[in-house]
Swiss-Prot record:
NCBIfam families for this protein: PRK13659.1 (NF010180)
Keyword match Signal: yes
Family assignment from sequence similarity: Belongs to the UPF0482 family.
HAMAP family: UPF0482
Keyword Signal in annotation: yes
This protein's name: UPF0482 protein YnfB
Domain of life: Bacteria
UniProt keyword terms in alphabetical order: Signal
Residues annotated as signal peptide: 1-28
Amino acid sequence: MKITLSKRIGLLAFLLPCALALSTTVHAETNKLVIESGDSAQSRQHAAMEKEQWNDTRNLRQKVNKRTEKEWDKADAAFDNRDKCEQSANINAYWEPNTLRCLDRRTGRVITP
């Protein structure tokens, strides 16, 4: 198939304006500046998941804190009871370190100093 010179020029004359029209739309300028705050849907979802996990472990954290506080209160009360037992006017009172109680030497019963 032979393409004559006139057909080539006609085809070129048709394609050149089309190519220029397409290239001008591709290179369109804009005066708008887009600034992203970093607050994307993915970061919001990640934050929501972290908050949910924090809330789920809240009950466990509270239990641990209560247990620690309870053990500290128990040790503090035992320390105070030991001091009272040792300073008691009752000569038969003695402090039992294994049970953390003040006992009577004669009977072995718990006494209140």
